[in-house]
Amino acid sequence: MAKILISPSKYIQGPGELKKLGQYVENLGKKALVLITESGYKRVGSAIEAGFNDSQAVMDVCYFNRECSKVEVDRIIDKYVNQGDCDIIIGIGGGKLADTAKAVAYYTKKPVVVCPTIASTDAPCSALSVLYTEDGVFDQYLFLPKNPDIVMMDTEVISKSPVRLTVAGIGDALATYFEARACKASGA
């Protein structure tokens, strides 16, 4: 049986990498739409701006409404993508934000870059977006044809994330290990 590795096209990890974000995305396009929460922008906005100051790419910021829903995806597409001429989608935040960025990129056929700010989910690297209703109830899985073009893990940002979320990420990784072993044993 063949073994296949499915992963992002490029994975970048290290301290201070958000300060180089603009340089990393230059090859994907010239105008990036950065999806981020307002509180996230207060924490890392200066690093993102510095990364684009040293780049030929420019950025526009869209504040995420905290729910990965079809309504939110449509809002972002209508207000920012269709009217803003962006050619790259960047999601900076947690799992729901990453899933929203991937869904927006999928529906608009744009490259996507995911920069997690917590290490508690596998959403940044997966070819899947989980969509919810506006009330936070599960709606659907959106299976994507490819993984993100770039996943950038700024370890300075991750090191400052809440401990409970890091512990949750460790638990998720351990569970994934046992899930993979069970799948392999069953021949799935």
Roles of regions detected by a PLM:
Residues G40, E67-S69, K96, A119, ...:
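Glycine-/small-residue-rich active-site loops that bind phosphorylated ligands and cofactors
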Residues M1-I88:
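ATP/NTP phosphate-donor binding region
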Residues I12, I89-G93, V167-G169:
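Short glycine/serine/threonine-biased micro-segments
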Residues V34, G91, M153:
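Redox-cofactor binding/interface segments in oxidoreductases and associated redox assembly factors
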Residues Y80-I118:
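A short, small-residue-rich loop immediately preceding and capping a beta-strand
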Residues G14, G95, L174:
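Short, conserved catalytic/metal-binding motifs centered on acidic residues
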Residues L18-L21, Y41-G45, K96-A103, T121-C125:
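Short glycine/serine/threonine-rich phosphate/pyrophosphate-binding segments
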Residues Y107-A188:
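A glycine/threonine-rich phosphate-anchoring loop and its flanking beta-alpha core
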